Amino acid sequence: MKITAIYPGTFDPLTNGHTDLIQRASKMFDTVIVAIAHNPSKQPCFSLDERVALANTLLTHIDNVKVIGFSGLLADLARDHNANVLIRGIRAVSDFDYEFQLANMNRRLNPDLESVFLTPSERNSFISSTLVKEVARHNGDVSEFVDPIVMAALNKKLGCSYSK
């Protein structure tokens, strides 16, 4: 039986923490769908199309990873793509409470969907897209936290000029 997993998120922008989890998940599952969310309650820095394009560029070397944009319920997306695993990253204990509630809701909406929680590597445990954008907005060095392609896109989008 082939197992398809979905790794959902806003990915605004995709960080080294995200790509680490995607690479690790790609070794665990036959197919990993990186599902980039359009969330009307958030004001992303990058448009959905820009986030999908960045992710496609960064993940093209991983054969069993597919990048899509989506809106709507994750449980429905999983059903539409015959995915039975939902990958979620947990950076700290504080993330677990929300993720636990989300896993239970998704299982209620789609009983065939199981959540798998992955912890980041130690070097990525504190990285978040929000922090990366905040540092970049102040011309800080984010090269340790994102791919050079993302750093260039952030510099262009935010009008920053940091370079190493």
Swiss-Prot record:
It catalyses: (R)-4'-phosphopantetheine + ATP + H(+) = 3'-dephospho-CoA + diphosphate. ATP binds at residues 10-11, 18, 89-91, 99, 124-130. This is Phosphopantetheine adenylyltransferase. HAMAP family: PPAT_bact. One of its GO terms (cellular component) is cytoplasm. The keyword DNA-binding does not apply. Pathway: Cofactor biosynthesis; coenzyme A biosynthesis; CoA from (R)-pantothenate: step 4/5. Homohexamer. SUPFAM superfamilies: Nucleotidylyl transferase. One of its GO terms (biological process) is coenzyme A biosynthetic process. Substrate binds at residues 10, 42, 74, 88. InterPro entries: Cyt_trans-like (IPR004821), PPAT (IPR001980), Rossmann-like_a/b/a_fold (IPR014729). The record marks 18 as: Transition state stabilizer. Belongs to the bacterial CoaD family. Its EC number is 2.7.7.3. Reversibly transfers an adenylyl group from ATP to 4'-phosphopantetheine, yielding dephospho-CoA (dPCoA) and pyrophosphate. It is found in: Cytoplasm. The lineage of its organism: Bacteria, Pseudomonadati, Pseudomonadota, Gammaproteobacteria, Alteromonadales. It comes from Pseudoalteromonas translucida (strain TAC 125). One of its GO terms (molecular function) is ATP binding.
